[in-house]
Structures are given as C-alpha cells and as structure tokens.
Curated annotation (Swiss-Prot):
InterPro entries documented for this protein: Class_I_gatase-like, CobQ/CobB/MinD/ParA_Nub-bd_dom, CobQ_GATase1, CobQ_N, CobQ_synth, GATase_3, P-loop_NTPase
Any Gene Ontology biological process: cobalamin biosynthetic process
Function summary: Catalyzes amidations at positions B, D, E, and G on adenosylcobyrinic A,C-diamide. NH(2) groups are provided by glutamine, and one molecule of ATP is hydrogenolyzed for each amidation.
Name listed for the protein in its UniProt record: Cobyric acid synthase
Pfam families (UniProt xref): CbiA, GATase_3
Pathway: Cofactor biosynthesis; adenosylcobalamin biosynthesis
Domain of life: Bacteria
Molecular function GO terms recorded: ABC-type vitamin B12 transporter activity; catalytic activity
C-alpha cells in the first residue's frame, strides 16, 4: 500500500506506473483505493462510478474498471459536506462530521471489495488518501493505516521532494504515527526529484537512519506523466494537467468551485494549435475564440459563483461577439433558462435563473444517469462517444435542435438557432479525434493532435519505464509476498 506524507505527492501516478510495469511483467494486477475524494469520476464496467484515478490505474493494468477498485467515493458539494458513493452507487449525503461517525460502518464494505480484488489478482496495489500522519482522523480510519492494519497490508510512504521539506515530512510521519501503525511501514519513496539525484543521496541515508525504513526509490520528475489526466482540480491551477501549449486559438474555461470531470479538456489542451486557459476565481475570462463551461457537482451553487466572479458578463459579451460557447453536463444546464432543485439534492432546495442562452430548463431529480453512449454529430457523419453522469431532466423547445444523435430516436444536447451555443451531457466528447477536428475547424484552425487515447497509452508505458528505472520494484514484490 502506497500512502503519502500529504495530498498530491504523486501516489496515484506511482500506483499507475508500477501497475503498468508489473502488468508488462506478466502479473495480474488490480488497483485499489479504499476511500477517494474527487469530483472527477468515471463509470465502472460493472456499474456505478469510481474516482478517475482508479479508472486510469485499471487502464494501466489493461483491464476494465470495477466499482470494487474504489468502494467509497466522496464527491464534495460544499466546504463541509459531500455526496457519498459506496460500491458505485449513491449512498447519500453527509457533512464531514457526520461522515466521521459513519466510517466504521463502511470498513466491512471496503474489506469486502478488497477481498474480491485479491482473489482475482497476483498483487493488489493499494493507494492511500491524503496524509498518513493526520492522527486527528485516525479513529475509524478506512483510508490509510486503519485499512492497512485491518487488511494486514504492508505500507510504503511516499514524499514529494519538489515541494520542499521531504526529510521533515517523512521523519515527522514516523514520529507522529502510533507504534502499531508505524510497524506496518516497510519503506519509503521520494518522488519528483529534479536535478542531479546524487545530490540527495545523503538525504536518503538520513531518512533511513531516522526512520528505520528501507529506501525503495528516489524517483525523478517524469515529464511524460503530464499527458495523463489530473486527479485534483487544484492540479489544474498548479499546471499539472495536460501539457501547456501556446497555440493561436484561445479556449477559456472558468474554474468553477466544484468543477467535475475536467479531464474532458485534456485532448484540447494537448493540441498544438490551442491555448487552453483555465481561469481561476477572481480573474475575468479573456477574449477567446471559444468558452467551455465545464461540468459541476453543484450546479446552482457554481452558477452563483460564476455570477459572483462576473463571468456571466464575460460569457454574454462573448456571445454578442458571435463566438462559440460550449456547455458540458452542468455547464450545459447553466446555459439554459432555469435550473430547479425542488428537493435539495445538490444543496438548499430552490431554483436559479440560467444564462438564458439555450431554450431549455432542468429539474434535478434523485435518479443519477450513468451510462456509456456513442453516436454521431446530428446531421453530420462525425462519430462521437463518451459517457453520461448526471442528475437532472432537461426539457424545452431548444431540444428540437439537438447537438448529437446517440442512436435511433435518441437526440441529445442542444444548439442555438445560429449554431454558436452548444450544450451536451456527454462527457469525453473531445477525446474522439473526429469531433475534436470538427470543432476546431469551426474555429478556423486545424487539429494537429494525434489520437488522444494513443497518447495516454504511450504515457503509461513511459511512466512504467520510469518506475522500472527508479523504483525497487523487486523489493516491492518481496514485501507483498
């Protein structure tokens, strides 16, 4: 089990890289994360939803994702509360305090999923959550040491040298851990080294000396990993998602507080001809060729935030200039005339006026639609594929002008009368090269990007090569025996 000294130290990519490396060696590997907190979710092949990081790790193992790989998924809806997804299905909502009381009841479910995966595999690579040293949350823990001890899984602690203070982070983790928890730790990894690794040889020795843990690798920064999807919205602001480009075509994206499934944007960010601008709160949307309003976990609250930051004014000005606007899932709902949440599924019950750019209205309902879809651009021979993941029924006269056709008598999405404003529930739309080329052609630019899925595969193989070179994988296998 790879735990971390903190959030965003690279646990997800370490697991993905080692998973691909072991899979290439001929082992049957399964990824597992007992508890994840993310609004970036994926549809599991056996139903329900899991964190997209675990879906990527499953891909690294060359298998379809299962809801057992992430049995507890927390999808933040406010500063103090989240939607709780258990084994792929929505379990309810809870404040952070209420969830702390609920965790011991979920341990059995977590162990059940882990047991199912363990029976399928030669090795299960487990990823912890956040920091292993948050001892204030240790009681009832199911994400880190609580799980490790319950499942009797050896632990490796990962630290991030790029952010500084990695010696203190690792030694400090050993210091604050309960002795029985510390006894589960077999070694450590130092991740994201930049420059000459030999300059930190003494640091590795000091960590070994101070902790008694075995050094299992000093892992340099891996540039190839930038082609892989970011897990956390904060990574977007830190520039850790898709490669930065400086193309002439500017696409602006407002960073909604509860932005969801933002890996929709990765293929556009990888285009040489495109500059994808993620606009943080407090900054105006720049003059752009297109604006994409992304998915959202709390649509009414994020629509209010969009107005608070003045982005609605920027979007309406962009519309008057006759430039393209695309809404994805929650962003699609925001483009309509109104959004209604009569039962308070995403927050306080009520309604909100939309941006009024599409002739639709949406009512949020308890049933969550989770399905993979494929078809083509309406009235065009342009194939599309992706998935839907939303709560809400959309109606209105605008639906007479659908964006997509997803089967016989299955129109989907909406387009304004002049074709400038578009909305859809289909995530993953830009991953298809044909639709991406079509979209960029409407912006008078050619697509120079290759197949995005091929790029992800190449990045996973490059990451596996990186792990083979810098991680003591044979020692990891010995620890798991």
């Amino acid at each position: 089990m790879i735990q971390g000294t903190g959030s965003s130290v690279g646990k997800s990519l370490l697991v993905a890289g080692v998973s691909r490396a072991l899979t290439r060696r001929g082992l049957v590997v399964r990824p597992f994360k007992p508890q994840n907190m993310s609004n970036n979710a994926a549809i599991a092949a056996d139903g329900g939803e899991i964190g997209r990081a675990q879906a990527l790790q499953a891909r690294a193992c060359r298998i379809s994702p299962s809801h057992h790989m992430n049995p507890v998924l927390l999808k933040p809806q406010s500063e103090i509360g989240a939607q709780i997804v258990v084994q792929g299905k929505v379990h309810g909502q809870a404040t952070a305090r209420a969830y702390q009381a609920m965790k011991p009841q979920l341990l059995g479910t977590v162990l059940e999923s882990f047991g199912i995966l363990r029976k399928q595999a030669d090795i299960v690579l487990v990823e912890g959550a956040g920091s292993a040293s948050e001892i204030n949350l240790r009681a009832g823990d199911i994400a880190n040491m609580g799980f490790a001890r319950a499942a009797n899984v050896p632990v490796v602690i990962a630290g991030d040298i790029d952010r500084g203070g990695v010696i203190a982070a690792l030694v400090g983790t050993k210091t604050v851990l309960d002795p029985d928890d510390a006894a589960m730790v077999r070694g450590f990894l130092v991740n994201r080294m930049r420059g000459d690794p030999s300059l930190f040889a003494e640091g590795m020795r000091l960590i070994e000396q101070q902790t008694g843990w075995e050094a299992l690798g000093l892992v340099p920064h891996c540039e190839a990993a930038r082609a892989l999807p970011a897990e956390d919205a904060a990574d977007l602001l830190r520039g850790l998602s898709a490669p930065t480009r400086s193309g002439n075509t500017v696409i602006a994206v407002p960073m909604l507080p509860h932005i969801a499934n933002f890996d929709d944007l990765d293929p556009l960010a990888a285009e040489d001809s495109v500059t994808l601008v993620m606009v943080p709160p407090g900054q105006p949307l720049p003059v752009a060729d297109a604006i994409i309003i992304p998915g959202s976990k709390t649509v009414i609250a994020d629509l209010a935030a969009l107005r608070h930051h003045g982005w609605d004014i920027d979007i309406l000005a962009h519309r008057r200039r006759g430039r393209s606007i695309i809404g994805l899932c929650g962003g699609y709902q925001m483009l309509g005339r109104a959004i209604h949440d009569p039962q308070g599924f995403e927050g306080p019950a009520g309604s909100a006026a939309g941006l009024g750019l599409l002739e639709i209205e949406t009512v949020l309902e308890p049933h969550k639609i989770l399905t993979s879809r494929s078809g083509h651009l309406f009235n065009h021979d342009v194939p599309v594929s992706g998935y839907e993941m939303h709560m809400g029924i959309t109606t209105g006269s605008g639906l007479r002008r659908p964006l997509l056709s997803l089967g016989p008598d299955a129109p989907e999405g909406c387009v304004s009368a002049d074709g400038v404003v578009m909305g859809t529930y289909l995530h993953g739309l830009f991953h298809g090269g044909a639709f991406r080329r079509h979209l960029l052609a409407t912006l008078d630019v050619s697509s120079h990007g290759g197949d995005h899925e091929d790029a992800v595969e190449h990045a996973l193989d490059a990451l596996a090569d990186h792990m083979e070179a810098h991680v003591a994988i044979d020692r990891l296998l010995a620890l798991s025996a």
